[in-house]
A protein has these predicted regions:
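Extended, subdomain-level signal for the structured scaffold at the beginning of enzyme domains
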Residues: 1-97, 101, 109-119, 129-177
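Catalytic nucleophile serine of serine hydrolases
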Residues: 105
């Protein structure tokens, strides 16, 4: 499968957007990736719409060198996790290594706090447009696209396009390894 041998971390915490989390995780697993759910501490959390989401491991216990990519779903979770340096440092390290990072909906809030959006094209929930622009990104109103190693998705309705771009970016990363 196109992502065999890749390990992808997905950020999770209370209030994560259920579909952005679960559909993306399922698509990555379907493509052959090993997926780990990372958050502040191992636990079972509730998504924004009530689905259970397992947090497998604390983000501080994950070496960024041990993962091949990262996904930052939206919901209410990004506004909470962006406040923790352990989260933003993890995101910044993966970005600095040039590994693919998928960012959808409000996930851009964590990317802003990790200081990885300046100079790039971005999208997400319209509610964070000003935040992205103020952080130095260019706003693009498209369902999903790649800008270097960042894969952007707009909102829940754009999950299929986001997953296509994300899998393609991870497959390209795998081929270049």
């Amino acid at each position: 499968m196109e992502l065999d041998g890749l390990h992808v971390a997905v950020l999770a915490g209370e209030g994560v957007e259920d579909l952005e989390y679960w559909v993306t995780v399922m698509r990555l697993r379907e493509a052959g990736a090993k997926v780990s759910s990372v958050g502040l501490a191992p636990a079972t959390v509730r998504g924004k719409n009530g689905l259970e989401v397992p947090v497998d491991v604390a983000v501080g216990d994950v070496n960024p060198d041990a993962v091949d990519g990262l996904v930052i779903p939206g919901g209410h979770m990004p506004d909470k996790l962006r406040r923790y340096a352990v989260v933003t440092d993890f995101v910044a390290a993966i970005h600095a290594a040039g590994k693919p990072i998928g960012i959808i909906c409000h996930g851009g809030l964590i990317a802003i706090s990790a200081r990885i959006v300046a100079g790039c094209r971005s999208t997400g929930s319209l509610g964070i447009k000003d935040d992205l622009v103020n952080a130095g990104a260019t706003w693009v109103d498209e369902p999903a696209f790649r800008d270097a190693n960042l894969v952007w998705g707009r909102v829940v309705e754009d999950i299929p396009a986001f997953c296509r771009e994300l899998v393609a970016a991870l497959a390209a990363y795998r081929a270049a390894k």
